[in-house]
């Protein structure tokens, strides 16, 4: 009632990042050779509240390609077509592929993360696999409309136990502990399953 409404023509990059897959794609758009949103355009500065950290460090056996590796990251494994937020650690022998890893998460030695969104302060144990198998079509049992394209989502401060194996379209609730995986035989979480925090 009575308020003025104004429109503005915008020809720049825009994407609705509400759906999980759209958020994932928007982040991975940034690692392209000519990204639709140029983070290095000096005429369009990004003002952020990120804390000061040391530069990213790549170890002697590290390999990072087609990726954004933020300040404070330490990479001793392989990172491909991924976005690493500040403070992420990728340990020796670990592989991160087609994934978004948020603030201060640790990917343990020999772990594999493939096609995932991992929230901040998560620990992925040694030798664990997040996003395994070829079945990208079986939707998540709890979020079938949101997780049905092969992306596995891990919530904030979750702890994935060493040797665990999570399929595609899995959902790991925030603050899940290793003992919350006890109901899965041999720590294998099938595609489309959810890991809940014990009450």
Regions found by a protein language model. Give the residues of each.
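Left-handed beta-helix
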Residues: 1-199
């Amino acid at each position: 009632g009575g308020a003025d409404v104004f429109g503005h023509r915008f020809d720049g990059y825009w994407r609705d990042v509400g759906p999980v897959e759209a958020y994932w794609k928007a982040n991975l758009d940034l690692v392209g050779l000519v990204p639709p949103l140029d983070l290095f355009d000096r005429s369009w500065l990004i003002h952020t509240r990120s804390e000061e950290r040391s530069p990213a460090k790549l170890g002697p056996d590290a390999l990072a390609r087609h990726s954004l590796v933020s300040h404070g990251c330490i990479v001793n494994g392989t990172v491909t077509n991924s976005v690493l937020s500040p403070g992420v650690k990728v340990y020796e022998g670990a592989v991160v592929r087609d994934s978004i890893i948020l603030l201060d998460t640790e990917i343990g030695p020999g772990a594999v993360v493939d096609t995932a969104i991992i929230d901040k302060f998560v620990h992925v144990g040694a030798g664990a696999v997040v996003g395994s198998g070829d079945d990208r079509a079986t939707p998540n049992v709890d979020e079938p409309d949101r997780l049905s394209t092969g992306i596995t989502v891990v919530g904030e401060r979750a702890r994935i136990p060493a040797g665990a194996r999570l399929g595609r379209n899995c959902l790991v609730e925030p603050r899940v502990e290793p003992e919350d995986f006890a109901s899965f035989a041999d720590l294998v979480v099938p595609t489309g399953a959810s890991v809940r925090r014990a009450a």
